Amino acid sequence: MSMSDPIADMLTRIRNAQAVEKASVVMPSSKLKVAIAKVLKDEGYIDEFAVTEQGGKSTLTIGLKYYAGRPVIERLERVSKPGLRVYKGRNEIPQVMNGLGVAIISTPQGLMTDRRARATGVGGEVICYVA
C-alpha cells in the first residue's frame, strides 16, 4: 500500500525519534524531503543530513539536535495536507510564534522559510511549522 502523505510521515518520524532521544532518524528519501532537511539545517534545527543509496533506494538520514537534554525542535506541525492544501499569498504568509519559529513554504523559487519568502515577495504552499 502506498503512503498518502510522505511529508507528514517524515515529520512524525522526527517527532518520535526526538521523543525517545535518538541521535538520528532514517527514512525513505525524496527531493522534497531533502529540501525540507536543508531548510531545517540552515535554520539550526538539525545537526546534519545525508542521502545514501541502499539497494537501488535512497534513504535520508537526519542527525537530531538537543540542547540541555531537550530537543531543539519543540513543535513540528504539518499545515498543508493532501486533502486540504493551504496556499498563502505574499502578504498573507504566517508568522510562527511571532517570529521565533519558522514556516516552511513551497514557492516557485523552491522551498524557503517564511522570512525569506516575505523578503523575496513570493507566496506559496505552507508545508509545515517548526518551533
UniProtKB/Swiss-Prot annotation:
Entry GO CC: ribonucleoprotein complex; ribosome
Any Pfam family: Ribosomal_S8
Record-level Gene Ontology MF annotations: rRNA binding; structural constituent of ribosome
Gene Ontology BP annotations: translation
Keyword field: Ribonucleoprotein, Ribosomal protein, RNA-binding, rRNA-binding
Record bears the keyword RNA-binding: yes
Gene3D superfamilies tied to this protein: 3.30.1370.30, 3.30.1490.10
HAMAP family: Ribosomal_uS8_B
Assembly mode: Part of the 30S ribosomal subunit. Contacts proteins S5 and S12.
Task performed by this protein: One of the primary rRNA binding proteins, it binds directly to 16S rRNA central domain where it helps coordinate assembly of the platform of the 30S subunit.
Family: Belongs to the universal ribosomal protein uS8 family.
Name used for this protein in its record: Small ribosomal subunit protein uS8
Organism name: Ralstonia pickettii (strain 12J)
